[in-house]
Amino acid sequence: MSQTITLIKDKILSDNYFTLRNITYDLTRRNGEVIRHKREVYDRGNGATILLYNSTKKTVLLVRQFRVATWVNGNQDGMLIETCAGLLDNDEPEVCIRKEAIEETGYDVGEVRKIFELYMSPGGVTELIHFFIAEYHDSERASIGGGVEDEEIEVLELPFSRALEMVRSGEIRDGKTVLLLNYLQTSHLMD
């Protein structure tokens, strides 16, 4: 017998920016036992992220920006170094990530390649992130980047080896960024 889930109650606790819901459900275990659970679930929509790399120059493009959740959790200045990313907002993942790449980094890249999609914090957050990589070239620079009006984003072009060192030293602590840098390393695209 497989597990079955029965929704008992779905109550919205807050929908000011994203949606925080209180979910009550019964989980019927494989042995037939029914257990009632009550959990809060944060729904912020799905997202996409991309690591831009240049195999000739052996560099990657990352961004540095303020992330309030990290500040609340002890990151003194709230600044985080990460891959370009954004919420889908009803766009297809590739459409979203192309827009975000131009807005944040200023690069209008050619071919993008989807690597995988992952739940980053499935214990309480619904978000599914689509992961991409793309090679960038200086000729594809369309603007200075930096994000939209309410964002202040610094574009960082780093040697790939330096980015990997920054993961080890704790200067890069964003999960999606670490995953994509490790993917780039193990795929040997920078060899």
Curated annotation (Swiss-Prot):
Mg(2+) 1 binds at residues 85, 104. GDP-alpha-D-mannose binds at residues 17, 38-40, 67, 85-87, 104, 127, 150-151, 176. Its cofactor is Mg(2+). InterPro entries: NDP_pyrophosphatase, NUDIX_hydrolase-like_dom_sf, NUDIX_hydrolase_dom. Signal peptide: none annotated. It catalyses: GDP-alpha-D-mannose + H2O = alpha-D-mannose 1-phosphate + GMP + 2 H(+). Pfam families: NUDIX. One of its GO terms (biological process) is ribose phosphate metabolic process. GO terms for cellular component: cytosol. Residues 43-180 form the Nudix hydrolase domain. The keyword ATP-binding does not apply. In the dimer, the N-terminal domains are swapped between the two monomers, such that residues of both chains contribute to the active site. This is GDP-mannose pyrophosphatase.
